[in-house]
Amino acid sequence: MLNEQNIRLIFGLKLRQLRQKKQMLPKQLAKAAGISQSYLNEIEKGKKYPQPQKIVSLASVLGVSYDEMVSLKLDKQLSPIIDLLQSNALQDLPLETFGIGTDKLVELIANAPAKVSAFISTLIDISRNYEMKVEQFYLTALRSYQQMHDNYFEEIEESVQLFMKEYQENLGVDFDFSLESLQNVLLEKYRYKIDKKRLSEYPELRSVRSLFVKKRRKNVLLLNDNLNAIQQKFQLGKEIGYQYMKLKERNMGPSWMQASSFEQTLNNFKASYFAGALLINREPLISDLKALFKKSKWNGEAFLQMMKSYQVSPETFMHRITSVLPRFFGLNQLFFLRFTNTQKNDEYVITKELHLPKPHNPHGNQLNEHYCRRWITINILKELALKQKENKKAGPIVRVQRSLYIDSGNEYFCISIARAMYPTPNKNSSVTIGFLMNKDFKNKVRFWNDSNIAVRMVNETCERCRLTDCQERVVEA
């Protein structure tokens, strides 16, 4: 079923094609039909649908009947567009986010309709053949969006600074990043009700951190009562982000629940970015990182203490670093990986990744291959599991490694933190930032050649590795 927008698109494409067949310029057709050239441009771009009398005038000038002009039937050249529009494929592509306006798309389709529609349909078919769910498609698009901006978003940073300024002006005190202050903002400014008991009544939701319930009089935030203070602060900061930036389209549950549009996925990211930027303010972090990079020796304990000083989770801390480094340090050749692992299990899964500015050697694999067991991000999970046998509350732990890729020759300096995935039982996660060890990195990070840091030959997966004497190999190549 074609909606109004698609009908406008079809009419505009048909009008443009008929005009070109008559070898008329837009200015000539507009004058002959008694309409302005700007109005004609709006019609051809699919933004406007003309009144009946205007259609009569256009049809007369172009030498076609009124019925032919308004018919949704297209000639052979343009017919693939109908299939494309009816498939809703364009709705699955977040084109506007990437600066591809409807007018540009219409122009592309009009110039090569069969090729463009076939290309877009192929993208959709590939995603279906690989059983890529719609939300996975949205997440892939989101990663591309982050890469375009080096994972730094000035407009959100400015929103955070403005929020803190308004807080200080209204209350006469600086925002102190405490759990109580975050709760009070939601309770008093945005009239929320925060319920920490409801989720515990449903065992199947014990791993869900929060749910948003929109009500006419008062929004309700259901918080998992098993969350620690650090996790609660992030969820509250995220809710403030939604409200302060007026992000209306949202997924009511956690990010892994199915999103019905790319805008929901994007807004979830924006709210999370806001929370990270609020809890880890930009200027103190830049100062801390400058001091860290000046040291000639790596100090893991000092790195953990830096993280703890912000009272945030390892993932929030490491992800925030990936936002600051490209913009303020010029270190934009990096990757971020999050692995999860069930205790007493040798299966390791990448659940989040980001590559700046392009894919690096360690990356997700959809073929169920076995990731290289020499990666620090996997070894640190093994180490944490061993520590948890002695102490269930062990962690977080931090480790570093220089990883030299056998085939590409690329070398990465990797910093990894592992912790228990509280409140999810019996699961651990590790987050890793890997820096391409180019001249720029070595000039800015003094401890890159600390002799105490291990250098290991690594590869991507066991199945693709040519090493024959690898003790860590879990399957044959």
Please describe what each predicted stretch is.
Residues 9-10, 17, 27, 31, ...:
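Short juxta-domain linker segments that transition from a proline/glycine-rich
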